[in-house]
Amino acid sequence: MLKLFSAFRKDKIWDFDGGIHPPEMKTQSNGTPLRQVPLAPRFVIPLKQHIGAEGELCVSVGDRVLRGQALTRGRGRMLPVHAPTSGTVIAIAPHSTAHPSALAELSVIIDADGEDRWIEREGWSDYRAHSREALIERIHQYGVAGLGGAGFPTGVKLQGGGDKITTLIINAAECEPYITADDRLMQDCAAQIVEGIRILAHILQPREVLIGIEDNKPQAISMLRAVLADAHDISLRVIPTKYPSGGAKQLTQILTGKQVPHGGRSSDIGVLMQNVGTAYAVKRAVVDGEPITERVVTLTGEAVSRPGNVWARLGTPVRHLLNDAGFCPSADQMVIMGGPLMGFTLPWLDVPVVKITNCLLAPSVAEMGAPQEEKSCIRCSACADACPADLLPQQLYWFSKGQQHDKATAHHIADCIECGACAWVCPSNIPLVQYFRQEKAEINAIRLEEKRAAEAKARFEARQARLEREKAARLARHKSAAVQPAAKDQDAIAAALARVKEKQAQATQPVVIQAGSQPDNSAVIAAREARKAQARAKQAAHPMADSAIPGDDPSKAAVEAAIARAKARKQEQQAGSEPVEAVDPRKAAVEAAIARAKARKQEQQTGSEPAEPIDPRKAAVEAAIARAKARKQEQQTGSEPAEPIDPRKAAVEAAIARAKARKQEQQAGSEPAEPADPRKAAVAAAIARVQAKKAAQQQVVNED
């Protein structure tokens, strides 16, 4: 009795809510064996035939390829695609693909050479001798993807299962009307399918392996039972025919009684599902060493004269397959890729066959019926009763039309499997699946944009944080350098302070002039020569400055007066005039004032900075030079004394010179002269006294 209950519990199946029973229409194509189709002259192989990114190209235009040669490299979810036959790559360009929008995707276009030569194939007949990782990598690199319609990379799916998979389910339900590709494959290749299932079981190591098949496929059931007669590791479960029992979540619930949670995956409850076509492709990749280059495609509908299932090479144009099946198009003929409920209408027939293409339906006008006008929703809830995912299609319809994305997401629109059961039962002929597809696409686009914005924000915040860290580190370095200067900086500071103190000491040192001594004026002379050179350079740089000198220059007048006096004295000496009186001190003072005025005016004209105060030692040197010149002039002109100079006349000339100097300073807008230095006055007085004494002595000598 216990064994009886165990057997009953072991073979128990469950049911799911909703579902419909549309006309099956499978007998048109499942009665004839699989057949080969002649090679097309040209193949179009899209680089993306799966869920995920397209692979990296590894061929170029003009390359010759063999059947099974990789056209792209697969990394991660980037599944590679392979050449369906031997030939030459004539173009790599966008081409319309198998998609409801008929968007153009990058494709490799190959002209077949008709030889259909394979690459060198290396099969692993003893696959158990290889590791799990090696088997998964081989399956991935040979381009195996889910052939049931989703197109998810099989290697990635097996890798993600890991050790948490307890049940492996092989989906053989094929519940949609018209499609018989899996049915015919199980009838003709049951042994190869079972071998592929065992390879998958070897990789996953589940506790049980279940094959779910609907009871409307008696021939396929018989073939599988014959192959599994002596097998105890694989169980065959026959389930009632009901659409959409072939859905992943629905078949999982039927065979295990477990429901996949909202937003979750079947692996969350320890279940992994593969299609029978995928199991066959796994066997060919591992045991035979053949990448996936072809698949079974159902050609059916009343518009074709020879319906059936064919081995179609990937990249073959749809037009080529339909013509081989005797396609007789009508005026408004449509061609559907997929089934009547989940398929989509092709915009033209140059679309290529891809890995997820399982059926090409060419119905007649009578078969499809007259087009129905879309009407308003009457809230009958028939769609909710038929929904196998326990959703509320009528609410999702309103949310989709109103662009209420948040509410549509809250009502689990992502769980919609787009089976079309709701649209099938809708009395208002509302294409609900089209609304749901568009809404899900918009939600995905919004999420993608939000993800990109979040990534951009993260990058910006990371950059700001990095800049703040660099700024803080820079300030810390500057602060540390200011608090603790380097040794060489301290030495430089000490040297600068020493120079400043030395200059201050020199400035405060009094000037002492000893009678009869000759001071060392070499430094002063060198500085004066440097200033003269600087003044000459400035005059050369500003040649126009000389032209601005007014005609009544006091210094010029003084020079002319001095020249005139010298000429007069020379004339008197030649004529034998009276002896020259002693040099008047006031005249010497006048000459010194004139010299200072000339220096200030020269500095104003050249735009230089104000002159430094006159050094007493400099005045002494100039006086000594003047005396030497006077003595030399007297020696040259003879011993006769010159006519004495009138003191009042010299005073008047000095006053006139001072008045002209002050007037010139006012006209030029210069700053007032600095007050006379007491030391300078003392020096000038001493010089005058010395000159007077010397003149008196000279006069006495002349009289003697």
Curated annotation (Swiss-Prot):
PROSITE patterns named in the record: 4FE4S_FER_1 (PS00198), 4FE4S_FER_2 (PS51379)
PANTHER family assigned: ION-TRANSLOCATING OXIDOREDUCTASE COMPLEX SUBUNIT C
Species of the source: Salmonella paratyphi C (strain RKS4594)
Mode of membrane association: Peripheral membrane protein
Sorted UniProt keywords: 4Fe-4S, Cell inner membrane, Cell membrane, Electron transport, Iron, Iron-sulfur, Membrane, Metal-binding, Repeat, Translocase, Transport
Catalytic activity, EC: 7.-.-.-
Chain residues that bind [4Fe-4S] cluster 1: 377, 380, 383, 426
Binding site for [4Fe-4S] cluster 2: 387, 416, 419, 422
TM stretches of this protein: none
Gene name of the record: rsxC
Subunit comment: The complex is composed of six subunits: RsxA, RsxB, RsxC, RsxD, RsxE and RsxG.
Main location: membrane
Lineage: Bacteria, Pseudomonadati, Pseudomonadota, Gammaproteobacteria, Enterobacterales
4Fe-4S among keywords: yes
Gene Ontology terms, MF aspect: 4 iron, 4 sulfur cluster binding; electron transfer activity; metal ion binding
Role description: Part of a membrane-bound complex that couples electron transfer with translocation of ions across the membrane. Required to maintain the reduced state of SoxR.
Gene3D superfamilies named among the record's database cross-references: 3.30.70.20, NADH-ubiquinone oxidoreductase 51kDa subunit
Biased composition (Low complexity): 556-565
Protein name: Ion-translocating oxidoreductase complex subunit C
